[in-house]
Amino acid sequence: MLGITVLAAILACASSCGDPTFPPNLSARVVGGEDAVPNSWPWQVSLQYLRDDTWRHTCGGSLITTSHVLTAAHCINTNLTYRVGLGKYNLTVEDEEGSVYAEVDTIYVHEKWNRLLLWNDIAIIKLAEPVELSDTIQVACIPEQDSLLPGDYPCYVTGWGRLWTNGPIAEVLQQGLQPIVNHTTCSRLDWWFIKVRETMVCAGGDGVISACNGDSGGPLNCPVEDGLWQVHGIVSFGSSRGCNTYKKPVVFTRVSAYIDWIKEKIQL
């Protein structure tokens, strides 16, 4: 049975984690996916940057404490100004009920992030002020250090990424079923081969349902006991041939490989 890591008092920012007030519809199919139930993934955030006096969605992320968001290192450009949208469902509605925008204090990119090889694709955003939790804004659970999920374990990727390769960005939050692909399979020659490291986790690859551009940094949500959810992955990369390419599952940064690093950064 998979345990929920509380990380002592650090990650215990709420009485519970990974427990949405509004449960997701798990029959839904990001590319090939469907609209999520509003606020059913309440730790999902929209990372936005400012250009020409307009805030634009660039990546997803997961709220892991009231002050910290987990995202991908490749989402971060030190020349940009960011804000974090929490409690969001429809990105076209600025003043959406139950949502807030948080300013950013500090961004911690993994010290060994490799932009060429996409190793250590993880970052933590510290918010300028703690956010108030509600039915629409909650913290995610994260797994125990080094825990692994078996092949075909049913997880869900969520985000506002492109609805299909080179297509439009989604207006409302999407979700898609992405079963885990074990490392042995994902590292086969005709899959991802040596590009996939053991600090990564693959999911999907059926050629139908997939994450896409704009989903980067967002969570791979996996069910555990008592109806709770853990974020086991951070959307990192996919195939240059298209977002839903057969035998090219989405590759996620495996959160359980970085628990010690996460704990270190959120104590700063």
From Swiss-Prot:
Enzyme superclass (EC): hydrolase
EC numbers, comma separated: 3.4.21.2
Catalytically driven reaction(s): Preferential cleavage: Leu-|-Xaa, Tyr-|-Xaa, Phe-|-Xaa, Met-|-Xaa, Trp-|-Xaa, Gln-|-Xaa, Asn-|-Xaa
Glycan-carrying positions: N25, N79, N90, N182
UniProtKB keywords: Disulfide bond, Glycoprotein, Hydrolase, Protease, Serine protease, Signal, Zymogen
Bridged cysteine pairs (disulfide): C17-C141, C59-C75, C155-C222, C186-C202, C212-C243
Protein name according to UniProt: Chymotrypsin-C
InterPro entries (UniProt xref): Peptidase_S1_Elastase_sf (IPR050850), Peptidase_S1_PA (IPR009003), Peptidase_S1_PA_chymotrypsin (IPR043504), Peptidase_S1A (IPR001314), Trypsin_dom (IPR001254), TRYPSIN_HIS (IPR018114), TRYPSIN_SER (IPR033116)
SUPFAM superfamilies: Trypsin-like serine proteases (SSF50494)
Keyword Disulfide bond: yes
Catalytic residue positions: H74, D121, S216
Residues that make up the propeptide removed upon maturation: 17-29
One example GO MF annotation: serine-type endopeptidase activity
Highest rank taxon of the organism: Eukaryota
Matches recorded under PANTHER family: CHYMOTRYPSIN-LIKE ELASTASE FAMILY MEMBER, ELASTASE 3 LIKE ISOFORM X1
Family membership noted in the UniProt record: Belongs to the peptidase S1 family. Elastase subfamily.
Pfam families given in the database record: Trypsin
Gene: Ctrc
The keyword Metal-binding is assigned to this record: no
